[in-house]
Amino acid sequence: MKLDGVEIAIEKTNRRKTVSIFIERDGSVRVLAPVTATDDTIENAVRAKEYQIFAKLAKWKELNQGKVKRAFVNGQSFLYFGRNYRLSIEENQAVPLKLTGGYLRLDKKYLSKAEKVFKEFYREKAQQKIQERTKLIEDKFSTKPSSIKVLELRNRWASWTPKNRLTFHWKCAMAPVGVLDYIIMHEMVHLKYPSHSPAFWNELDKKMPDYRERENWLKQNGVKMAL
């Protein structure tokens, strides 16, 4: 459906009891609704939240004015677990990309496919760190994730499935560890509460009382977590 020219993606799922509206990381609007919800019910729910939708879209546009596009040249900075490291182009390096001596060092012969090399580097490092941090967090839960993967997700930092599989975006390797912990904790709470119900947020608040501060960092700086 469209709302004053804005395309809205609608997804029906048996995991929802009410209609929920989300502004995704790429600025798209997504509606999750129960499978029993009629088109009129969904449209009325969207219309009722029209002001909030456009207010959030305006905020998204404001934040995304700082969107970055990095060049693979000497001195360019790249985020790595919350810190900026400058790029150094090297010759005859044993591996395509490594972090050493305070620099991200890229072998010159991989310049033509630098973006692919960086994505794989971040994916591997995110996988390692997320496995490590999840082990520290999962003791607080009775249900454990059945698997953890790191991929390139379209418009989310992470996702879960009813089979308790967790998937994270490789860009999570750019976030500070404290913010990464929030992303993990958020998905872990979904293992108990599938939807963003009041019970979900209460549980998240109990498990991580300062989650709002970490979430806000992600909202304010997520646009900078890019190549």
Locations of regions flagged by a protein language model:
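Active-site-proximal or metal-binding-adjacent scaffold patches in catalytic folds
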Residues: M1-D181, L191-L227
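Walker B catalytic acidic pair
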Residues: E187
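Walker B beta-strand of ABC/ABC-like P-loop ATPase nucleotide-binding domains
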Residues: I184
